[in-house]
Amino acid sequence: DEAILANLKADMIKSRADAKLNQSRCFGALRTYVFYGPDFIRRTTLTNPALEAMSSEILLAKIGELMGKQHEVLYYGPQSEKEVTEALAMHHKTSAELQPLDKKHLQLLPTDESKVLMAQYDAKQLYYLQYANLGKQFDVAADPEITLYNEYFGGGMNSVVFQEMREARGLAYTAQASIMQPNYADTKYGYMAFIATQNDKMQMAIEAFDEIINNMPESETAFKIAKEGLISRLRTDRTVKEQVLWSFIGLRNLGLEEDRDKQIFEKVQAMTLADVKAAQEKWVKNRKYVYGILGDIQDLDLNYLKTLGPIRTVSQEEIFGY
């Protein structure tokens, strides 16, 4: 139906234009650019002219090709395995020989050198992130220390980052930081820290942020809250219904067969603030970062930002891909 396709294109073009006016959407696009780079955006995003040129014939052909490629069928529901198998045999028609998929997992960009990527957004508040590729592939044995570090340092309103940057120093509207876990066995850990602050507080906020990231404040009271909160959540969390399927696939992607929370729950019981400090020194301290800043560039102190690394300005078209 060409009329429906034309309306779909118009809706998508408008949605894309609206996204460029939204600060959070702009920051999300910048973050993706910082993590994965321009090649990933070009491979996964149609430009507006390419979108406009898309025809019903092309789309239907692409959908038809899917049934000739290797795939899995997930089912959660009341039917028995026999009933589901019979329904698939009747309705799920595939090619006799399925083409294998070229499985290339999305990789974080390296952060061998510090640099600053800036994107323009007209506002009195800026969004700031610093990102590091930690260079290590998944290791399930690291789950307890990483999980407890994230809970203590950057996990929520009681975390060290939030309390220091917003409550104690008044330098950010919000703040968070965490070690990012791989989704596949061959992908690497990353580190991402984020603050939203006023343009005129940028330098003070970044310097304070860097100080607490590299020289983590130690509070037994905050640690107790974090540890108890984590244990309580693990004790009550349940994997139910269709979550069981996604949990199985997530574990399989990491080469695991046993639920990760079991080990975390058992190991965290005996962990101390010293263990969190050791994790911070092992995973976080003195890393090189790529910095991403979304804000009104003419209102920011570029001389200060140059001390973080060479600056490059990226356009909306670059970060969104259209």
Sequence positions of predicted segments:
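Charge-rich, well-structured scaffold segments of protease-associated domains
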Residues: 1-100, 174-322
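Short, structured coil/loop segments at alpha-helix boundaries
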Residues: 22, 139-140, 146-147, 165-168, ...
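Intrinsically disordered, low-complexity segments enriched in polar/charged residues with Gly/Pro
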Residues: 38, 60, 103-107, 151-152, ...
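His/Glu-based metal-binding/catalytic segments typifying zinc-dependent metallopeptidases
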Residues: 100-160, 194, 320-322
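A general structural signal for short secondary-structure junctions and capping/turn motifs
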Residues: 64-66, 108, 119-122, 165, ...
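A structural supersecondary motif
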Residues: 129-134, 154-196
